[in-house]
Regions:
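Active-site environment of divalent metal-dependent phosphoester hydrolases
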Residues: 12-15, 46-50, 75-83, 131-134, ...
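Binuclear metal-dependent phosphoesterase catalytic core
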Residues: 23, 188, 205-283
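N-terminal active-site segment of His-dependent metallophosphoesterases
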Residues: 1-61
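Extended active-site neighborhood of metal-dependent phosphoesterases/phosphodiesterases
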Residues: 50-151, 156, 181-190, 211, ...
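A cross-family glycoside hydrolase active-site/sugar-binding cleft signature
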Residues: 7, 41, 72, 160-162, ...
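His/acidic metal-ligating clusters that form di-metal
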Residues: 27-38, 122-124, 133-216, 270-283
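Short aromatic-enriched loop/helix-cap "lid" or pocket-rim segments at secondary-structure transitions
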Residues: 17-18, 81-87, 170-174, 209-212, ...
Length: 283
């Protein structure tokens, strides 16, 4: 089974590099990879969770992907669950509702041989911004996760979300999910085999093991972030996607770059981003 993970596309209704890259990626997925499943792990839109034009532009571009597509939110899609949310844009019930109105869901569970070609794996996606938010939606997602963990009992699990569970320099607000939520989440799958945790958010590609769990960071399709090992930013910054090959009990995760795509190193030099930032600051 082939799964493609893309992340941090940061699409704007103004077009530019994000739209150009997404168009090339859709063609590459359709003609060269032909995966069984595509998962977007968030930051679909460029910056503003309240921009309907950006959501509409993202929907139009992602609709070009032929394979089954599941979309999870990032902090730029629904606001942030953090002590000091970016641009004072916290996650809210209204922002979650706007996301689910556009995409139909902010979590998923894929299981069964018809969907996965194997009864041995369960693929689960969650909204990382619900974690630690204190919203009613957080409690509702925990209840759903408890049921999902029950369905995954005795099986291998691949978990997708926007923010990482682990970071080389430890848990950090705005970078990782809260430590207590990470521990609760991992404990939920004690009767399953949590094999892979796949996130975005950090705009870098990295594979590392946390015990027996493979933790994969997916790079951004738009932005390149300079390595800074002292701050925990390890791995590769090249724009691209992660291709997973799942067969029986084995899973492989590889960075795959998309021909013709470019990366933005200085976000403030990107007119689509500065326009979104100006709109946020004007409110």
């Amino acid at each position: 089974m082939r799964i493609v993970q893309l992340s941090d596309t940061h699409i704007s209704h103004l077009g530019g590099v994000p739209a150009d890259n997404m168009s090339l990626l859709a063609d590459h997925i359709n003609h060269d990879i032909r995966p069984d499943l595509v998962v977007h792990t968030g930051d679909v839109v460029i910056a503003d969770p309240d921009s309907r034009p950006d959501r509409d532009a993202a929907k139009a571009l992602l609709a070009r992907i032929d394979a089954p597509l599941l979309v999870l939110p990032g902090n730029h899609d629904v606001g942030e669950s953090a002590d000091d949310p970016w641009q004072d844009l916290p996650v809210t019930s209204e922002r979650i509702a706007a996301f689910t109105s556009a995409w139909g869901q902010d979590r998923f569970l894929v299981t069964g041989s018809a969907a996965t070609r194997s009864d041995d794996w369960v693929f689960i996606g969650i909204n990382s911004e619900r974690l630690g938010s204190g919203l009613p939606e957080e409690r509702e997602q925990w209840d759903w996760l408890a049921d999902a963990a029950g369905q995954a009992r005795g099986k291998s699990v691949m978990l997708f979300l926007h923010k990482p569970l682990w970071f080389p320099t430890g848990s950090q607000s705005g970078i990782t999910v809260p430590e207590a939520d990470r521990e609760r989440l991992v404990a939920l799958f004690a009767d399953a085999r949590l094999r892979v945790v796949s996130n975005g958010h950090l705009h870098r590609f990295r594979r590392a093991f946390q015990g027996e769990i493979l933790a994969v960071w997916a790079p951004s399709m738009t932005f390149a972030v300079t390595a800074d090992p002292g701050r925990g930013l390890e791995g590769e910054s090249a724009p691209g996607i992660v291709e997973y090959r799942v067969e029986d009990d084995d899973v492989q995760a590889e960075l795959r770059q998309v021909p013709g795509t470019g990366a933005v190193a200085d976000v403030l030099a990107m007119p689509e981003f500065t326009a979104a930032l100006a709109e946020i600051e004007s409110r």
